[in-house]
Amino acid sequence: ADGFISCVAALCAIRICPAVKDYVITSHKSKEPATMIILEALDIPVFLDCDMCLGEGTGAVTIYPILDMALAVYGGMCTFSDNQMENYVPLV
């Protein structure tokens, strides 16, 4: 969901078919005053808070490269054993 209007549409879709929630990505928190009400109702984490306004359409364009990078790191990062290192152990 990219901003207020698409978050409202996502909430409507979820109310019709709750399974839809598993497929909704909320890209950013819009500056629209009602956005927080909708986001609280959706109960889905928001990735960005960049003061973007209604209708810009930049949230989705911004979030997908970030998701691609995160997946690349997750899928391609070496493990401790790959690097012949001991596993991390918290000090406390």
Where in the sequence are the language-model features?
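A generic structural signal for tightly packed, nonpolar segments enriched in small/aliphatic residues
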Residues: 3-92
